[in-house]
Amino acid sequence: LSLGTIKKLLQILAQGLKAICNHRDLIAKGCQA
């Protein structure tokens, strides 16, 4: 894997975590902390 590919994968993971946080209020509070 190249660094660019790893960075893209990390971005996708971060976006996925944000989406989960946005859909669950309790988890969203935990993610913001």
Swiss-Prot record:
UniProt entry keywords in alphabetical sequence: Disulfide bond, Secreted
Entry's localization field: Secreted
Annotated Gene Ontology cellular component terms: extracellular region
Tissue: Expressed by the venom gland.
Coarse class of the protein's main subcellular location: secreted
Source organism superkingdom: Eukaryota
Task of the protein: This heterodimer may have anti-inflammatory properties, since the myrmexin complex (composed of 6 SS-LS heterodimers) inhibits carrageenin-induced edema in a dose-dependent manner (after subcutaneous injection into rats).
Further facts: There are 6 heterodimeric myrmexins which consist of a small subunit (SS1 or SS2 or SS3) disulfide-linked to a larger, quite structurally unrelated subunit (LS1 or LS2).
Protein family per UniProt: Belongs to the myrmexin family.
Summary of subunit composition and partner proteins: Heterodimer composed of subunit LS1 and subunit SS1 (U1-PSDTX-Pt1b), heterodimer composed of subunit LS1 and SS2 (U1-PSDTX-Pt1b), and heterodimer composed of subunit LS1 and SS3; disulfide-linked.
Protein name per the record: U1-pseudomyrmecitoxin-Pt1 subunit LS1
Biological source species: Pseudomyrmex triplarinus
